[in-house]
A protein has these predicted regions:
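A glycine- and small-aliphatic-rich helix-loop capping segment at beta-alpha/alpha-beta transitions
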Residues: 35-41, 73-78, 127-146, 169
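Active-site glycine-rich loop that binds ribose-phosphate moieties when present
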Residues: 104, 133-171, 205-209
Length: 304
């Protein structure tokens, strides 16, 4: 049996049937330095509260799965070093060995589902890495979306990935890719990509109905909601494309592989955009949190 510890706030919301929104914790441990990481996580939680839902940041602390973090736990995680980055393959071992870890999209979905949380906000999902035809580097997030019934709100897949192949895999796995409010799939920091929206939905209520209908049909898996970054915060794809290509070439030349690829690329893109990529990342995460809260509220009304 997996023992979960709910924060006081999450426990109150759960017992009273209030809408909850799950949040991952790798943005705290692997996304930005202290104290900015804690400040951003606190702001995102506040955005969810302001939008009428309760945030539940998920992490493993000393071998225990936490659904929602108390302020002192958030501080501890934000200041910790050598925190494990947990996906589907790592989560159980971390729990069994008393470890501490931050949850990726896949692990957060698993934990949210066990906690009875149906909606999860993140920045961008993982996917098929460029060059995957030789490296076979494909994120476990895609398989998780195909089997765990959680609606994930993101700004699409991370722009450093092969978006075309990522969308093909999602289609093969039967994952609904719903773009919110536009006809083009967003590219994380950019509102536009070369790819059309597989599905378009224009309201949180319709997304909630789709989630409920999928469960009623007994179709496994969740759905991906691609929420474009606000126009005032985006980095145009024309500016980003050469920067990403240059960073990719540097990584290949340096022989960087596996889990080290994404942090390297994000650091180089941060440097080349003079911090604009991080500012855009914060804006899109906050935007996703607000939409996720609206979906969670709509879903609660459907099931009340």
């Amino acid at each position: 049996m997996i023992y979960m510890t709910f924060s006081a706030e999450a426990a109150r919301a759960r017992s009273s049937g209030q809408p909850l929104v799950a949040l991952e914790s790798t943005i705290i441990t692997h996304g930005m330095p202290y104290p900015q990481n804690v400040a951003v996580a606190t702001q995102v939680e506040a955005d969810i509260r302001a939008a009428g839902a309760t945030p539940a940041t998920i992490a493993v602390l000393d071998g225990r799965l936490h659904i929602g973090l108390e302020p002192e736990q958030l501080q501890r995680l934000g200041q910790s070093r050598d925190v494990a980055k947990l996906s589907r393959a790592d989560l159980a071992v971390c729990l069994a060995t008393g470890g501490t870890g931050a949850t990726t999209v896949a692990a957060t979905m698993i934990a949210a589902h066990h906690a009875g949380i149906h909606v999860f906000a993140t920045g961008g999902i993982g996917g098929v890495h460029r060059g995957a035809e030789t490296s076979f580097d494909i994120s476990a997030d895609l398989q998780e979306l195909a089997q765990t019934p959680v609606t994930v709100v993101s700004a699409g897949a991370k722009a450093i990935l092969d978006l075309g192949k990522t969308m093909e895999v999602l289609e093969t796995l039967g994952v609904p890719v719903i773009v919110y409010g536009q006809d083009m799939f967003p590219a994380f920091w950019s509102r536009r990509s070369p790819y059309s929206a597989p599905l378009r939905v224009d309201s949180a209520e319709a997304i909630a109905r789709a989630h409920a209908a999928r469960r009623a049909l007994n179709v496994p898996g969740g759905q991906l909601v691609a929420n474009p970054i606000p126009a005032e915060d985006e980095i145009p794809v024309e500016k980003l494309a050469p920067i990403i290509a240059f960073a990719q070439a540097e990584a290949e030349e340096a022989g960087i592989t596996g889990k080290a690829v994404t942090p390297f690329l994000l650091e180089r893109i941060y440097e080349q955009t003079r911090g604009q990529s991080l500012r855009a990342n914060i804006a899109l995460v906050r935007n996703n949190a607000r939409l996720a809260a609206a979906i969670a509220q709509a879903l609660r009304k459907l099931t009340a």
